[in-house]
Structures are given as C-alpha cells and as structure tokens.
C-alpha cells in the first residue's frame, strides 16, 4: 500500500516548487512530480524575473529568500514614460521608508534555489523524470506512473505544469485565454550606469523595459504589437 500524501503537485517549476515549500512549512506531506530531471540549473545566462517588494517580504517571511544564492539586483528607482504623453513618473525607494521597490532576479538561479530546498525538505517527496496518468480524482486521488507499476495517492491534487497543461485538459478544467497580439524579445547587454534603477516605456508600438542584471549589465525587454514587428530589426 503506497503512502498517502496530503497533496500531489504536478509540475516542478517556480509555482510548483513554491507551493510545495509553503505547504510543507504547514507540516503537510507533498509528492512533487516533475516530468523532466529535477536538478540544480547551471547557466551563465540571465533571464530576468521582476519581483515586487511584497513578494520579497512573503518569501522572507517563509525563509525562502537568500541573496547569497539568488542572483538579484534591487530596484531603488523606477522611471515610467507614459504612452501619448510627455509626462515622466519617477518612483524612488526613499519615498517608501527607504525600502527597495522590488528586485530583478535571475529566473534560473531562483528556481535552482527552490529546487534545492524542495530536495532537502523531509515533507516533500520528489518524483522526477516521470510521466503519470490519473486513475481517480475522488479522494484518495490516485496517479500511476506510466513506465512502472507505482501508484501515487493523495487527498488533494494541484496542477502547476503550465498554461498548456495536459492534465487540465484531461480534467476538463475551465480556463480563460487572452491574446495581446504581442511578441516579446529579451536582450542582455553591458551597461554600467543603471545601478539599481529601472525604466519602463509605454508606446504605440509596444512596451519596453530596461532592468538591471548587476552593476555591469542590463536586460532589455520589448513586448511589440505584432502589427509593428517589421519596424524593428530584431
């Protein structure tokens, strides 16, 4: 008889890992299932992920923030240029009790940090490189591994395997889709004069952001409306 978990979580990305860790701190038992290899990610690339100060407070509250492991750059000042206006707005951390406005983190290093914590947690059983099928969605929920006779059981099932989740389709879960008719691009480049500052520009052709990676480089993110794609030499 397989051990029954409180929660079964399918999908070991940022949402799946974070959900598992928060539930584990409430002393629930979790089986975290990931289709790919669940391991520390080694990468020299910087993929920016913006976190608000409230998100960082939440992570710190649950002991899930460690600046020595996570590649992060604080945002102390945000400059916003509005569409169809000459107005420029500036937000400064000095106006908010001296706290940073947020941070730009490297997605890979943040996910690696969460993965390492999941693997060390006694309340989380990680099953990776696994394809599973749903046998029963009534409690206890049962999932079976397609390449073995193993069965995973739990009281609750949480699906976090992405927007195109096959599990959600199989369970006929309702969803809403929004088409912004945009294509996004991201570039990293050397630039030394944007220490802890970020820019966001709204224009007729799209939304542009300049985000600090570190003291030596920035990420440029452009979300272009598809009708204007040909105006740019990306």
Regions flagged by a language model, labelled:
Residues 163-234:
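Conserved FAD-binding catalytic core of PHBH/FMO-like flavoproteins
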């Amino acid at each position: 008889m397989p051990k029954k978990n409180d929660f079964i979580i399918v999908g070991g990305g940022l949402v799946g890992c974070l959900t598992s860790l928060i539930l584990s701190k409430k002393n629930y038992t979790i089986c975290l299932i990931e289709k790919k290899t669940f391991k520390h990610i080694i990468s020299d690339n910087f993929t920016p992920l913006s976190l608000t100060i409230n998100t960082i407070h939440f992570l710190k509250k649950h002991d899930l923030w460690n600046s020595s492991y996570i590649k992060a750059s604080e945002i102390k000042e945000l400059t916003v240029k509005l569409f169809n206006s000459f107005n420029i707005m500036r937000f400064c951390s000095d106006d908010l009790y001296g706290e940073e406005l947020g941070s730009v983190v490297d997605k890979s290093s943040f996910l690696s940090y969460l993965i390492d914590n999941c693997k060390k947690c006694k309340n989380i059983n990680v099953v990776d490189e696994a394809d599973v099928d749903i046998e029963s969605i009534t409690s206890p929920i049962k999932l079976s591994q397609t390449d073995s006779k193993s069965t995973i059981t739990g009281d609750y099932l949480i699906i976090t395997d992405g927007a195109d989740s096959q599990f959600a389709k199989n369970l006929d879960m309702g969803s809403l889709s929004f088409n912004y008719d945009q294509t996004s691009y991201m570039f990293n480049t050397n630039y030394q004069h944007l220490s802890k500052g970020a820019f966001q520009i709204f224009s007729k052709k799209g939304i542009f952001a300049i985000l600090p990676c570190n003291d030596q480089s920035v990420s440029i993110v452009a979300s272009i409306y598809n009708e204007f794609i040909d105006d740019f030499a990306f």
